[in-house]
């Protein structure tokens, strides 16, 4: 009976350890996905933030990173 109790305790510890490891893996995957999404969003915003890069159509100079709009943003 004593051996059975020890065996059950060991099994419970192993199962709880496995559950903790699996949860940590899920969080790590979510962190990777969030990191990649943030990088994609930054690339969509343009090199300098919330402005348009060179050769992108614009209506006002404030839309361009270079603050120079002549129908399209100039590079510098």
From Swiss-Prot:
Belongs to the conotoxin O2 superfamily. This is Conotoxin Gla(1)-TxVI. It comes from the Eukaryota. The modification 4-hydroxyproline is found at residue 61. The presence of a 'disulfide through disulfide knot' structurally defines this protein as a knottin. GO terms for molecular function: ion channel inhibitor activity; toxin activity. Expressed by the venom duct. Its main location: secreted. The modification 4-carboxyglutamate is found at residues 50, 63, 67, 70. The keyword Signal applies. It is found in: Secreted.
């Amino acid at each position: 009976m004593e051996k059975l109790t020890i065996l059950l305790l060991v099994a419970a510890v192993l199962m709880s350890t496995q559950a903790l490891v699996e949860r940590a893996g899920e969080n790590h995957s979510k962190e990777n996905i969030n990191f990649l999404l943030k990088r994609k969003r930054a690339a969509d915003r343009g090199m300098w933030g919330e402005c348009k890069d060179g050769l992108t159509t614009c209506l006002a100079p404030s839309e361009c990173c270079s603050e120079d709009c002549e129908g399209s943003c100039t590079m510098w």
